[in-house]
Amino acid sequence: MATKVQGKHAAEKENDDGLREKMIAVNRVSKVVKGGRTMSFAALSVVGDGDGRIGMGKGKAREVPVSVQKAMEQARRGMFKVALKNGTLHHTVVGKHGASTVLISPAAEGTGVIAGGPMRAIFEVMGVRNVVAKSLGSSNPYNLVRATLNGLRASLTPAEVAAKRGKSVEEILG
């Protein structure tokens, strides 16, 4: 199976609805049937609004453009909001999916996006300007994207932490 993974120079498009779309991978997959092999394509994409909203989609079809379109539509439907603070995260998070683990840390202004492959695409469409991310374990693009999104879903704002602990935000921030 050959996977075409697009990292730093992935094709990014901005739609008329203000969403940024990025293709992460396109796989050619085959199903073996009595008459031979049936080829199809599986596309993985992320969509973000540049202000903390992010979604991931996976589409399969007989032709590449159709699979890409399906992936983009699914990504738009499954978008969720991540709270950002000055273009970075509030705290360090760890995300897991399958054999992939990602460690995502906030970074100071001017650091930039220090992340590899699929994670970089996620942060760029999401609007994160400063972050340090490390992938551990499997480097499968699908698992990395899911692990990154699981970590981002687990991130909390200081107000949410304070509400859970029954304290004020000032007590949490020290």
From Swiss-Prot:
Family: Belongs to the universal ribosomal protein uS5 family.
RNA-binding keyword on record: yes
Gene3D superfamilies, per the entry: 3.30.160.20, 3.30.230.10
One GO-annotated biological process of the protein: translation
Function: With S4 and S12 plays an important role in translational accuracy. Located at the back of the 30S subunit body where it stabilizes the conformation of the head with respect to the body.
Secretion signal span: none
Subunit structure comment from the entry: Part of the 30S ribosomal subunit. Contacts proteins S4 and S8.
High-level lineage: Bacteria, Pseudomonadati, Pseudomonadota, Betaproteobacteria, Burkholderiales
Free-text note regarding domains: The N-terminal domain interacts with the head of the 30S subunit; the C-terminal domain interacts with the body and contacts protein S4. The interaction surface between S4 and S5 is involved in control of translational fidelity.
Ribonucleoprotein keyword on record: yes
UniProt keyword list: Ribonucleoprotein, Ribosomal protein, RNA-binding, rRNA-binding
Family annotation (InterPro entries): Ribosomal_Su5_D2-typ_SF, Ribosomal_uS5, Ribosomal_uS5_bac-type, Ribosomal_uS5_C, Ribosomal_uS5_N, Ribosomal_uS5_N_CS, Ribsml_uS5_D2-typ_fold_subgr
Name of the protein described by the UniProt record: Small ribosomal subunit protein uS5
Organism name: Bordetella pertussis (strain Tohama I / ATCC BAA-589 / NCTC 13251)
A single MF term (Gene Ontology): structural constituent of ribosome
Gene name linked to the record: rpsE
Domain S5 DRBM: 19-82
Listed GO CC annotations: small ribosomal subunit
